[in-house]
Each structure stands twice: as structure tokens, then as C-alpha cells.
Amino acid sequence: MKQVTVALLFGGRSAEHEISIISAQSVARHINPDHYRVVPIYITRNGRWYSEGIASSILELDIAALIRKSGTAAASLKLQEMVLASGQQPFSFTFAGIDIAFPILHGSYGEDGRIQGFLDTVAIPYTGCGVTASALTMDKALSKLCVSEAGIAVAPGVTVLAGDWEKSPEQILSSIPETLIYPVFVKPAHLGSSVGISKVSVQGELPEALAHACNLDTKVLIEQAMHGKEIEVAVLGNNDPIASACGEIEPGSDFYDYDDKYIHNTAKLFIPARLPEELSRRVQADALTAYRALGCRGMARVDFFVDEKSGQVVFNEINTIPGFTDISMYPQLMEAAGIAFPELCDRLLQLALEPEQPAKT
């Protein structure tokens, strides 16, 4: 069998830069070397692309340990130093000979349709969702509208544009409906890994949280906090996707934030989730409905809040390039479904080669 050449894209311009590297390291370890030749392509925070030499060195760096020991800022500085010390010139490589791209670029400029559009333009097939689905799912406000239209419950909330907040914060605060019950979460609409999210317990805390989120994004959501368990479902496939069993997150802090995910690692994961079987099946069905409603293909992780007492299932968000780190839920859910990490990588690469077809009804 001829080896397939895979461009592994990682790093990127988003706040999730370091997490992307850790995910790419996991993928590189698990791709079958008998079937695939991996060409690492590292994208710096300022958008410079490097292949082979420095990209390979970064894949070997234990960046997870560095983050835990010294923090994200120290890890970022280390990466910059490595690039400078390499003396390597950016963009000094060709896409000739690349058969498939495997973007592991979390957040902006990777998960939002931009890299997908570039790859479509140069006619390189790639893992995961296409341009439209990536752009829709990256925008938490738009994805909520789509899944709500498909009949899935969403949290009550309002959307604030950063430009409007900057011009007239008093008007924005006065326009927030009194029916919104505190606590609420203030979320940048286009960021992942819980970056920029604040929990607001009383109205007086809202201006600071909004100012912080509007500093990070052009659009912000204010969402009523939902009671219940944080449940995640891994979905895999194109026209006939499959849903994993439900996974449950028990946060180690007030909510499942960036530090809890990647630095302190205090959250507990339960696979399968501690839910009645009938309720679990409903969540799985809603995950597939959301996946199809948003036009996803390849993979996604769909997140919900589930109140076991009332039976309420509320859509939270969808991630089209979920984490692939050792502690990430997506590969663990697939492992529990009988799809080991190497097979998961293989399936994603094979799905990337399937032509898009109208979904079956």
C-alpha cells in the first residue's frame, strides 16, 4: 500500500495555540506510520508557516509539562525562542505531494472556516467540517439559532456586539431583559477552551465581565446558567454519522474553565455519563440532530447541560476540531465506543477523501 502524505497543521493564531500543539502531538503519535507519512506544519501566533525542522522539534517539546510548571506565557516564549534559534525561513516549503491535510488548529483561524477555505482553494482534502459548518459552529450565537430551529432547547440569553458595548455600555446594560435569571455566563462568541468566559452572580459584576469579553471578541453572549450535568457526545462520520456514549464532566472549580482543563487538571470525567439510559439516548439523538442541522462532516463534539431530575436537555456548544490531548473527551469517548486512537485517525483521514453528497433523509 502506497503511503499517504498527511500535512499536520498545528499552532495557529488563536488563544488555544499551545493546546493545538499538544493535540497535534497526540495525533502524530497515533497515526499509523505504515500507512501515512506525516509532514508537520507549524503556524506561529503571527501567522508564519514552518515545516519539517522546527515543526518537528516543536512536536517533540513537552509543552504540556511546561504549561503546568511555568504557565502558558512561558510556553509561548519558549516557542518563539525555538523558532528564532532555528534560523528557518517561513513559507519555505511546498504543498506539492500533500495528499490530505489534518488541521488541528483550535479556535480562530483554524476552526472557523478560514483554513478550510484555503485548503478548498488549493484542492487539498482535509479532515473535519467544511467552510460553512466550521463558520457556523464557531459562532456560538449562530449555532444556537440553528439548533433551536431544529427543535433542540438552548439556554436563554442575549447577544452583545463589542462595538455597541464600546459606544454605549449604559444602553447595553439597560437593554438586558429582566427575565434573565442570575447567575449568568458571559462568553466571547468565537473563542473556545472556555477562554474569556466569566461567571456573573449579580448584575453589578456584569460590566467588568462584558468589558473583558468584548476585549477578546467582536461578539459576546450573555447566557443564563443552566442547572445539571455537563455532558459531551463525540460524533464521527459524514452522511451517516455515529454518536458515542455520553461523557460527563465534573468540574474541579466553579465551572469547567481553561485552567481546569489544561493546567490544574482537576476535573473528573465519567464515561459513560451517570445518566439513566433513556436520557442518555435522548442526548445522543440531539447530538446527531445538531450535527446534521449545522451541516457537519468528519467529526465534532457536541456539548449539553442535562438536568437529570427534570429530564431537560439543553444545547451548550459544538466543537468541530475538538481537543485531541491525552485528557480530551473526544478520543476517550471514541475509545469507549471501540475506536482506538490510531483507528480514529485513520477513519478521519478516510472520511476526508469521501466526496460530499446530499444527506440521507
UniProtKB/Swiss-Prot annotation:
InterPro entries: ATP-grasp, ATP_grasp_subdomain_1, D-Ala_lig_Van_CS, D_ala_D_ala, Dala_Dala_lig_C, Dala_Dala_lig_N, PreATP-grasp_dom_sf. GO terms for cellular component: cytosol. Its cofactor is Mg(2+); Mn(2+). GO terms for molecular function: ATP binding; D-alanine-D-alanine ligase activity; metal ion binding. Its EC number is 6.3.2.4. PROSITE patterns: ATP_GRASP, DALA_DALA_LIGASE_1, DALA_DALA_LIGASE_2. Binds 2 magnesium or manganese ions per subunit. It is an enzyme of class 6 (ligase). SUPFAM superfamilies: Glutathione synthetase ATP-binding domain-like, PreATP-grasp domain. Mg(2+) 2 binds at E317, N319. ATP binds at residues 177-232. It catalyses: 2 D-alanine + ATP = D-alanyl-D-alanine + ADP + phosphate + H(+). Pathway: Cell wall biogenesis; peptidoglycan biosynthesis. Keywords: ATP-binding, Cell shape, Cell wall biogenesis/degradation, Cytoplasm, Ligase, Magnesium, Manganese, Metal-binding, Nucleotide-binding, Peptidoglycan synthesis. Residues 144-350 form the ATP-grasp domain. Mg(2+) 1 binds at D303, E317. Disulfide bonds: none annotated. Belongs to the D-alanine--D-alanine ligase family. Cell wall formation. This is D-alanine--D-alanine ligase. It comes from Chlorobium phaeovibrioides (strain DSM 265 / 1930) (Prosthecochloris vibrioformis (strain DSM 265)).
